[in-house]
Amino acid sequence: VPCLDSITTSRVLMTMDQYLKDHGYTTLIINTNHDEMRELTSIEQLWRMNVDGIILMATAVTMAHQNIAAKLDIPLLFVAQRYGAGVSIINDDYSAGYEVGKYAAYMGHRKICYIGVSGKDEAVGIYRKDGVINGLRDNGVSSVDLLETDFSLEKAHLIALDYLKKKQPTLFIGATDNIALGCLKAINELKLKMPDDISLIGFGGYETSQFINPSLSTVRFNNEETGIKAGQTIIDLIEGNVVDNLQLIGYTLIKGQSVKDLNK
């Protein structure tokens, strides 16, 4: 796994671990701390330990990942990133992004700033962003300001703060709830009000996001389903059963109170 302090990762791990335990397997968890080299060496180490299979919650799929996957003689399942030459379980990031873009346009927003992450993370950095942009475009919003940050709340806060000193959108869309919360911190710091002055949408559906007042509009991916599917799929691969190479996880758009209807 890339980290242990992510709510999303925790949800996936807990359901996956329980499913595997219920089916007679023991889970070994290695935290790579977003370090690609550590990720690759961990795969090699697990392979040498003669484990039955490996589940990789990847932040990127590089040529090095593809090379190591090609030489393994045990199943390797990618979770969270698309792997064209093998089996992967991913969130339907494009469709989720598209629905958010469509919703923002429906609520009358035209001055929009999207704060995303690097395209190195294809799922969030490319597919989710493209979904938002196309959802807006297909519903009459031809331009959106695009900014890039990492996954930390604090960096998102600084980027949003700098942007707000030059421009004021009617809506911030954060590629994650953490990024959206960074935007909220900047909004509050400048004595602006959410959603009266600036609306806010995130992705993640963390329970904490619903305790914000007004509650955050966000996309919740079914992380528990991801965990169960990962457990089922790795067992199927170990047993030599046929599985779908690409499995999409669904989502729900939670319409909180953080988006002002500008049509009224």
What does each of the following model-derived ranges do?
Residues 7-8, 37, 64, 123, ...:
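Residues that form or flank phosphate/diphosphate-binding pockets in enzymes
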Residues 33-36, 57-62, 82-83, 178:
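Short beta->alpha connector loops
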Residues 14-26, 47, 71-78, 82-264:
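Bacterial carbohydrate/catabolite-sensing allosteric modules
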Residues 1-45, 49-53, 130:
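Amphipathic helical "hinge" segments at domain boundaries
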Residues 38-42, 63-65, 155, 159:
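Short acidic active-site motifs
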Residues 61-72:
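Active-site-adjacent beta->alpha loops and helix N-cap segments on the catalytic face
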Residues 1-3, 32, 58, 116-119:
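Short glycine-centered, acidic/aromatic-flanked micro-motifs in structured strand/loop junctions
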